[in-house]
Amino acid sequence: MMPGCEAPAVARPLLEFIGADARVPLLGGGTARYVNCDSAASTSALACVRDAVDELLPWYSNVHRGVGYKSRLSSWAFERARERVANFVGADRSDSIVLFCRNTTEAINRLARRYPFRPGDVVLTTLMEHHSNELPWRRAAEVVHVAVTAAGRVDEEDLDRKLSAHAGRVRLLAVTGASNVTGYINPVHDWARRAHAVGAEIVVDAAQLAPHRPIAMLAKGDPERLDYVAFSAHKMYAPFGVGVLVASRGAFEIGDPDIVGGGAVDIVSLESTYWTDLPDREEAGTPDIVGVVALARAIRALEEIGWERIARHEALLTAAALERMASIPGIIVYGDADPGNAGSRLGVIPFNVLGVPHALTAAVLSCEWGIGTRNGCFCAHPYVKTILRVSEAESRSIEKCILARDRSAIPGTVRASFGLCNSLEDVDILGRALEAISRRSFDPGYVLDAERGEYTHPGFSPDFAQRFQF
């Protein structure tokens, strides 16, 4: 096992992550260890990932077609990383390709632009989706949404109804593997079987799923095969700017590449262009070589830790957090609040403190406790409005305010999310902070910036230039 990537132990307060011992200033003076409850947004880098980057940099050169030693070594590392990614998701290499890009958003946009849609085609998606797995499809086909239940889960009966109602027109079922809002894990293989039964393919946004559970795309012809999977390294403890699309080759063998330029061609004249083979034809320009290698090392770390240990670690943290929240007056948890179900979901908990705006709760957690959370709608506006029971009339009123640059009343929740960097001590600190907020035991001087929808304190202005300079 690699140094810096040892298996997690919940009793330990820290794992070997870059910045795990960082101390941040507090409103009342002094500092506190930063408590990262924001892994659903992005993750800190594993120490072993940083070490892998350091190992590569002395040998870094551009990939492909270079004959120098450094170029050949970098090319070798880049392609070995591609192989590791394919193995990580269980891709059928005879029919699937691994394409590197910037992030999950770009991966799904690229698929939406390159997929061979026909007039009248339908993309079936759900109200649970992150905007990145909904907005790109609007430009490509008719989008039909599957409803969610009162508990925020995808309505399976509505899924079947809409697959049947649009049979023959549904080309893609585009779904999230796990919700970035409620942490629900979706039965994507079962949904793949249902989609394939009506002649559709399935796209899985695995941005939230990939760091926490194994993925098995399965072989071509398997009724439960996942045809397309997208995810990002920055959510997998390798925040160096890489996203991945693992795709059926057929969608990219037709037509011109999405991005054209150097490396995508075999030969160019003033009159003609001949594209090279996949995957190079879809990766024009110099790729993020360092980021790709970092992702491969992070994958190795996760596999060595083991998925059962990862799931057990995060389930213990999630159950402890839910139990603590249930004991605090005024805490409202959205979605499944049962600690007994922590093992069948991710450690993503949306909540509010009754009577306290979500933006104020997040500000107090940060300024007075050194806890990093996130608040708002998490790039899933329709889903959050649904679980908050926001009416259509309220929604239209809020839209008018936002378009007038007033975000003071935007609906939302606070989101605490856990990963391998967290310990039970982190949960305890979060619990003590929420107890204080529930009692209204926090500084009364916070001011709302209506245009940004954020609370700040006039007496607290950290000098970030002391921490980082270009």
Give the ranges of each region predicted by the language model.
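Pyridoxal 5′-phosphate
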Residues: M1-F470
